[in-house]
């Protein structure tokens, strides 16, 4: 399975309108495309950073959707008041403990490793990091995506609410530090978001 993420530095006053547009207009439009699994959107109201991610059954389906998605993406970016930055990923891990509800939050970590070391990073996340992440209070789900060409990866952990995410911060840092050290990877940034749209629907993959 594959994913396309669109990051927009939004006008903070436009975030609610943008999230509503993604939920009410973008999602129904994308559902008409072959191979779509689902869509999610995360927002950071303090910084204005928003990330929408569409998931696809195959890389071919993701690539085939590019032209049709562009106009939809550009309209969403216009409403949010920012320019879209697009990245493509392979979804290599998806694990859910239970569904998310209103108020759910997500912590993401962007990682970098050598292109030839991506499989080792995936294995470390799957066998060493994920079992510990599952033990965090308020844990809902976790995913891991990679771009093999660039050596980039993104881990995402979803929590029931902001209080659970806040309480997990120090323990999550220890897990992340141990995992990246073991895999010889570096952390590019760590961000925390509100889960504004939750319709990703990616099947279990561990």
What do these predicted regions represent?
Residues 1-51, 57-206:
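Short S/T/G/P-rich N-terminal loop/turn motif that feeds into the first structured element of a domain
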């Amino acid at each position: 399975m594959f994913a396309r993420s669109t990051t927009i530095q939004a006008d903070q006053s436009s975030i609610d309108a943008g999230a509503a547009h993604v939920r009410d207009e973008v999602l129904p439009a994308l559902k008409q495309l072959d191979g779509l699994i689902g869509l999610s959107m995360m927002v950071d109201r303090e910084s204005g950073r928003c990330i929408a991610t569409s998931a696809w059954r195959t890389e071919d389906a993701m690539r085939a959707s590019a032209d049709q998605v562009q106009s939809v993406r550009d309209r969403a970016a216009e409403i949010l008041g920012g320019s879209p930055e697009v990245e493509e990923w392979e979804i290599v891990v998806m694990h859910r403990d239970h569904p998310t509800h209103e108020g759910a939050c997500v912590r993401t970590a962007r990682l970098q490793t050598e292109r030839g070391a991506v499989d080792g990073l995936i294995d470390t996340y799957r066998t060493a990091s994920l079992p510990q992440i599952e033990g965090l209070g308020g844990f809902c789900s976790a995913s891991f995506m990679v771009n093999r060409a660039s050596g980039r990866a993104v881990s995402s952990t979803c929590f029931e609410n902001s209080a659970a995410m806040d309480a997990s911060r120090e323990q999550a840092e220890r897990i992340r530090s141990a995992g990246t050290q073991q895999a010889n990877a570096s952390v590019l940034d760590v961000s925390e978001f509100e889960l504004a749209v939750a319709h990703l629907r990616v099947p279990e993959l561990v």
